[in-house]
C-alpha cells in the first residue's frame, strides 16, 4: 500500500512538473500583451519587445498627453494586458489612480524613468543660481505645461538610453523566458540611440549660438545634455495671433538679441507666422515634442529617430549662426531664495518653524544615493566643475555625525542624536544676522541659545533655510558650537543639512536636484 502511495505521489509530481514546463513553453512561444501610454513609450517598448509581444498605445496622435484622462475602455485595456508601460507620474498624472483601481494582479506595471532623478518643471523651479563657492547655499540647491518635475526625458537621446534600459530590465524580470530576446532587441535599439546621441553631440557641442527660444518648454534635458540653453516665452501659441501688446514687447526682445527663430511644437498657422515675421521680424519653426505620430506618418516611415534628426536639423537654424548670448525676457534669478531681499523684509522666527523629526543627508552622499545630483550639477555648470568636484564640495558641506535632530517647537527643545545617543536642550531665540556673501547675495542666520550650562558644543545653534520670515521649513542647514554666535557666523564651508525623517533617500535626492 505504501509503495502504491509513493508511486502515485511520484506520478503526480512528474505531471505537475510537466505542466509547469508546458506553461513556461506556452509563455515563451506566446506573445506578451503590452499597453503603453503615448508615442515615445510605445516606440521604445516596441523596440524592446519585438516579435515577442503585441504592443498597443492608448493615446493617439493629436491627443494632448498632459491633459489625457483614461476612459473606462482604456482602463479595461490596461486591466486585460500582461504589462502596462508609462513614462513618469509627472507626465501621466493619472497613473497612480489607475494603479489603485486595477483588480488584476497579473499586470506588470513599468515606469520608464525608473529611478532617474528629474529637474524641476517650468513654473516650479525656484531658479536657484549656482553662485560663489564660498557661499554655504550657493552650490547646494533644493526642489516644475505645470509639472512639479519635468518628465520630457525622451527628447534627449542620452537620457532615452536609460529609459530603454529601465523598460528592458522590468520586462525581462517579469518574463524571464523572453529576457534573452528582450535584451538582444534592446541592445540593437540602444546602439541606434547612441548613434543619435553622437550626432547631437557633434552638431551642438561647438554651437555658435548656445541659446534657443521656444514656445513649449519641453527641451530642457536636451539642452542640458548637449550644452544649450532653452529659453521659453509666454503669450505666443501656434494657433492664436499674439496681442498687439505682446507683439510690441516681443519685437523689442527679438531685436535686442538678434533672434531669428522662435520654435513651436507644431506648425504655426500662416496668420501667426506672418504676424511674427512682419511685426516682430522673427520666423516660426517646429521642434517636435514627439508626443504623437499619426498612423499615416508611421506608415510613411517616420519614427523617433527620423523626427529627432529633423529636430536637430531645425535647431541648427539657430545654433549654427553666431550671435550675442540670448537671455530670458525677465531675470528670475534674483529671488529671496537666492539671497536677494531688503533688510525690512527680514522677520524674527520661532523654533516652531523647524518643529519635527529631521535626518542628515550625509549618509545618502556616502552611499551614492545622491550621485545623480552631482552629474546634473556638473552639466548645469557647463564645465566649471565636474561631478567628482561637486561631490567633494558637498562632502565637506554635509559632513556630520549627528544623524538625527528632533525639534519640539512648543517645548522649545532640540534633541541631537549621535550614534544612537540622545542629548536634549531647551533654547531661547537670540535674534537674526544678515550675512553678505562674496557674489553680492545674502543669507539670514536665525540664532538660538541653550539654557542649560552643560550644552557644550550645542550651546549656540543657527538655522539657515533660504527663508527670511516665519514659515514652516522643508529642510535646513544647521550650525552649532560652544564658543559664540559670532564665531558661527564665519562658518561658510561646513553646513550639515537636514530633511524630514519621513523621506526616503531617493526622495531627498529628487528634492535637492530640483532646487
Curated annotation (Swiss-Prot):
GO terms for biological process: cell adhesion; zinc ion transport. Residues 1-28 form the signal peptide. One of its GO terms (molecular function) is zinc ion binding. Zn(2+) binds at residues 66, 152, 216, 291. Pfam families: ZinT, ZnuA. Keywords: Ion transport, Metal-binding, Signal, Transport, Zinc, Zinc transport. It comes from the Bacteria. Residues 126-148 are annotated as: Disordered. Residues 129-148 are annotated as: His-rich loop. Belongs to the bacterial solute-binding protein 9 family. Part of the ATP-binding cassette (ABC) transport system AdcABC involved in zinc import. Binds zinc with high affinity and specificity and delivers it to the membrane permease for translocation into the cytoplasm. The His-rich loop facilitates the closure of the zinc binding site and is required for zinc acquisition. This is Zinc-binding protein AdcA.
Amino acid at each position: 500500500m505504501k509503495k502504491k502511495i509513493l508511486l502515485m505521489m511520484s506520478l503526480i509530481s512528474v505531471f505537475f512538473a510537466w505542466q509547469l514546463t508546458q506553461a513556461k513553453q506556452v509563455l515563451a512561444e506566446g506573445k506578451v500583451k503590452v499597453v503603453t501610454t503615448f508615442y515615445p513609450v510605445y516606440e521604445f517598448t516596441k523596440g524592446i519587445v519585438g516579435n515577442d509581444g503585441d504592443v498597443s498605445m492608448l493615446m493617439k496622435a493629436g491627443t494632448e498627453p498632459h491633459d489625457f484622462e483614461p476612459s473606462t475602455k482604456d482602463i479595461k485595456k490596461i486591466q486585460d494586458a500582461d504589462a502596462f508601460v508609462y513614462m513618469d507620474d509627472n507626465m501621466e498624472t493619472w497613473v497612480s489612480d489607475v494603479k489603485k483601481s486595477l483588480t488584476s494582479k497579473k499586470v506588470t506595471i513599468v515606469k520608464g524613468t525608473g529611478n532617474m532623478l528629474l529637474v524641476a518643471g517650468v513654473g516650479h523651479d525656484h531658479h536657484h543660481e549656482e553662485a560663489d563657492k564660498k557661499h554655504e547655499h550657493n552650490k547646494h540647491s533644493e526642489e516644475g505645461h505645470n509639472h512639479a518635475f519635468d518628465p520630457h526625458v525622451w527628447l534627449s537621446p542620452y537620457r532615452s538610453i536609460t529609459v530603454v534600459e529601465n523598460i528592458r530590465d522590468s520586462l525581462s524580470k517579469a518574463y524571464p523566458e523572453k529576457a534573452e530576446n528582450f535584451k538582444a532587441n534592446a541592445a540593437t535599439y540602444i546602439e541606434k540611440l547612441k548613434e543619435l546621441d553622437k550626432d547631437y553631440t557633434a552638431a551642438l557641442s561647438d554651437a555658435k549660438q548656445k541659446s534657443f527660444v521656444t514656445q513649449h518648454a519641453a527641451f530642457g534635458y536636451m539642452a542640458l545634455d548637449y550644452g544649450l540653453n532653452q529659453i521659453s516665452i509666454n503669450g505666443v501659441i501656434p494657433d492664436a495671433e499674439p496681442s498687439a501688446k505682446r507683439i510690441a514687447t516681443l519685437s523689442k526682445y527679438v531685436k535686442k538679441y538678434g533672434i531669428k527663430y522662435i520654435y513651436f511644437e507644431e506648425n504655426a498657422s500662416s496668420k501667426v507666422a506672418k504676424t511674427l515675421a512682419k511685426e516682430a521680424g522673427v520666423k516660426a519653426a517646429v521642434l517636435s515634442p514627439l508626443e504623437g505620430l499619426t498612423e499615416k506618418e508611421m506608415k510613411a516611415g517616420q519614427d523617433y529617430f527620423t523626427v529627432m534628426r529633423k529636430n536637430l536639423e531645425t535647431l541648427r537654424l539657430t545654433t549654427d549662426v553666431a550671435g550675442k548670448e540670448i537671455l530670458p525676457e525677465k531675470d528670475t534669478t534674483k529671488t529671496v531664495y537666492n539671497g536677494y531681499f531688503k533688510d525690512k523684509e527680514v522677520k524674527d522666527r520661532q523654533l516652531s518653524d523647524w518643529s519635527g523629526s529631521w535626518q542628515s543627508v550625509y549618509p545618502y552622499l556616502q552611499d551614492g544615493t545622491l550621485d545623480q545630483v552631482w552629474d546634473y550639477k556638473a552639466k548645469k555648470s557647463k564645465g566649471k566643475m565636474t561631478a567628482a568636484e561637486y561631490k567633494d564640495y558637498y562632502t565637506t558641506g554635509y559632513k556630520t555625525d549627528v544623524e538625527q535632530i528632533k525639534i519640539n517647537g512648543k517645548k522649545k527643545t532640540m534633541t541631537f542624536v549621535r550614534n544612537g545617543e540622545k542629548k536634549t536642550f531647551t533654547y531661547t531665540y537670540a535674534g537674526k544676522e544678515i550675512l553678505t556673501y562674496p557674489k553680492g547675495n545674502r543669507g539670514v542666520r536665525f540664532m538660538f541659545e541653550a539654557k542649560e550650562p552643560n550644552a557644550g558644543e550645542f550651546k549656540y545653534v543657527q538655522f539657515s533655510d533660504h527663508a527670511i520670515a516665519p514659515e514652516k521649513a522643508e529642510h535646513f542647514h544647521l550650525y552649532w558650537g560652544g564658543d559664540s554666535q559670532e564665531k558661527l557666523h564665519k562658518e561658510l564651508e561646513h553646513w550639515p543639512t537636514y530633511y524630514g525623517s519621513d523621506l526616503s533617500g531617493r526622495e531627498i535626492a529628487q528634492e535637492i536636484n530640483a532646487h
